[in-house]
């Protein structure tokens, strides 16, 4: 009878990739003879995409020690005026019987040493306990956001009689270990509206973090503010009870060679060969994640700012969303690039800029010698990819917990410059502000200092995963807790 670690991913490609990377790290360290990895995932979610089965087939082929178990299809309860997160959380709860039967089935032929779940899969926590399986959370953002999530039930308790956070324009919240407070309107998107069922779901999830056997985090100790690590370890984030062990095991990011297999070869080669011809650290890379998208008016402001800055740039432009206020795009249908940019922009900047539609191989781009800065939506995976590559950032958050990440990147970690967003206009950024921040990062002494700091952090990221590194030590401590 072999030993297996079972991982349970939330719906969506990003969540599955995160679990795969954790599984690969465990097996890379201990070998498939010590543990096999089984990843449970759902079927039928409204956030599923056609790329998920393609990705799973590829990983199954290249990493045979990772097996996947897909649950039977479940139908979403789609009700009018209910948010996508609320629908998704209800969908996850409907999969609880499949979690139970999967653990039962796997336990017949193997010893389940640990059950690792995503935060949104909290309804599976008591199921793991029911089987006496040590159950852990995998937190796929940084330690500062973990500190905030652990403390969120306390904030909920203190603000029960107030309006929704989205309406508290003059309110800020203090989190243990954070240097600067966070605007209420910049809280994680899931809790902005008290009347959305996702609000109470998120408070429930966060209140259960301390009830697990431990929390595994995709970051490394050297990246995080010491005050945040101390606040978590010292129990300040869970004032009403014990904090479980926390294991920082990152940075876990997808490998370049695996990413490149899914790329559009011709377009990829074009942008990479263009980068190879540019001077060292001279190019600003702009990319806002797989879901990040802007209305045409904002795209024009970005273009004007880039043109006025005089800097070299590689800019990934996604199709503008159908709803003008939305910042998320679903699908990458073709669109007229010239039509969404200022007239003549592409021609006027052709000697120093390149604009690509929808996608670029981000991990590979960030590691190019010519890249000297990164305008990012502050998704945690993108942040880690920039840190590993030693590239400083301009922080432009869009949704999810990205405003929280921005606060920490700019104020606590000091590895990014924040753009000034007009909250009353949906986070709009003017062309003048784009130019100002681009020049600050690429031309100023402050930008150079940021670049030096990021270069050192890149070296520390590599060391953390080495034989004697902090993340390897933390993985060893986690494995000791389950064997």
UniProtKB/Swiss-Prot annotation:
Catalytic reaction list: phloretin + UDP-alpha-D-glucose = phlorizin + UDP + H(+)
Thermal profile of function: Optimum temperature is 45 degrees Celsius.
Source organism of this protein record: Pyrus communis
UniProt note: pH dependence: Optimum pH is 8.0.
Catalytic machinery residues: 15, 118
Function: Glycosyltransferase that possesses phloretin 2'-O-glycosyltransferase activity. Converts phloretin to phlorizin (phloretin 2'-O-glucoside), a potent antioxidant. Is specific for phloretin and does not possess glycosyltransferase activity toward naringenin, naringenin chalcone, eriodictyol, eriodictyol chalcone, apigenin, luteolin, kaempferol, quercetin, isoliquiritigenin, butein, caffeic acid, 2-coumaric acid, 3-coumaric acid, 3-hydroxybenzoic acid, 3,4-dihydroxybenzoic acid and 3,4-dihydroxyhydrocinnamic acid.
Pfam families given in the database record: UDPGT
GO molecular function: UDP-glucosyltransferase activity
InterPro entries to which the protein is assigned, alphabetical: UDP-glycosyltransf_plant (IPR050481), UDP_glucos_trans (IPR002213), UDP_glycos_trans_CS (IPR035595)
EC number(s) reported in the record: 2.4.1.-
Domain of life per record: Eukaryota
Family of this protein: Belongs to the UDP-glycosyltransferase family.
Disulphide bonds in the chain: none
Keyword vocabulary terms for this entry: Glycosyltransferase, Transferase
Binding site for an anthocyanidin: 15, 400
Protein's name in the database: Phloretin 2'-O-glucosyltransferase
Residue sites binding UDP-alpha-D-glucose per the record: 140, 360, 362, 377, 380-382, 385, 401-402
């Amino acid at each position: 009878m072999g030993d297996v670690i079972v991982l349970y991913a939330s719906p969506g490609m990003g969540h599955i990739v995160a679990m795969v990377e954790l599984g690969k790290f465990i097996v890379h360290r201990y070998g498939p003879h010590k543990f096999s990895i089984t990843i449970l995932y759902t079927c039928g979610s409204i956030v599923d995409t056609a790329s998920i089965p393609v990705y799973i087939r590829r990983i199954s082929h290249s990493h045979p020690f990772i097996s996947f178990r897909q649950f039977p299809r479940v139908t979403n309860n789609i009700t009018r005026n209910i948010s996508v997160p609320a629908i998704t959380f209800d969908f996850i709860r409907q999969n609880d019987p499949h979690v139970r039967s999967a653990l039962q089935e796997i336990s017949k032929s193997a010893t389940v040493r640990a059950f690792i779940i995503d935060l949104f899969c909290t309804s599976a926590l008591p199921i793991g306990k029911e089987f006496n399986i040590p159950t852990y959370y995998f937190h796929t953002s940084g330690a500062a956001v973990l500190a905030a999530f652990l403390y969120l039930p306390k904030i909920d308790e203190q603000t029960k009689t107030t309006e929704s956070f989205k309406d508290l324009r003059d309110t800020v919240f203090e989190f243990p270990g954070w240097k600067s407070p966070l605007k209420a309107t910049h809280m994680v998107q899931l809790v902005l509206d008290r009347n959305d069922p996702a609000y109470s779901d998120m408070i429930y999830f966060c209140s259960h973090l301390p009830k697990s056997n431990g929390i595994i985090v995709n970051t490394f100790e050297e990246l995080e503010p010491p005050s945040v690590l101390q606040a978590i370890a010292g129990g300040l984030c869970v004032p009403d009870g014990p904090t479980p062990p926390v294991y920082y095991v990152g940075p876990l990011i997808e490998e370049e060679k695996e990413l490149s297999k899914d790329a559009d070869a011709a377009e990829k080669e074009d942008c990479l060969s263009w980068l190879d011809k540019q001077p060292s650290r001279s190019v600003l890379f702009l990319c806002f994640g797989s879901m990040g998208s802007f209305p045409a008016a904002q795209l024009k402001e970005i273009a004007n700012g880039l043109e006025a800055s005089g800097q070299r740039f590689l800019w990934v432009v996604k199709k503008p969303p159908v709803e003008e206020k939305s910042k998320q795009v679903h699908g990458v249908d073709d669109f007229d690039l010239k039509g969404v940019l200022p007239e003549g922009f592409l021609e006027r900047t052709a000697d120093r800029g390149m604009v690509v539609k929808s996608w670029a191989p981000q991990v590979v781009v960030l590691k190019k010698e010519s890249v000297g800065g990164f305008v990012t939506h502050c998704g945690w995976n993108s942040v880690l990819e920039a840190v590993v590559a030693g590239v400083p950032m301009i922080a432009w958050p869009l949704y999810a917990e990205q405003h929280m990440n921005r606060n920490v990147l700019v104020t606590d970690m000091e590895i990014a410059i924040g753009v000034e967003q007009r909250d009353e206009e949906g986070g709009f950024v003017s062309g003048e502000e784009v130019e100002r921040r681009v020049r600050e990062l690429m031309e100023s002494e402050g930008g150079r200092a940021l670049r030096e700091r990021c270069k050192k952090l890149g070296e520390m990221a590599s060391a953390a995963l080495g034989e004697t590194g902090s993340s390897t030590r933390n993985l060893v401590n986690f494995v000791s807790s389950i064997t």
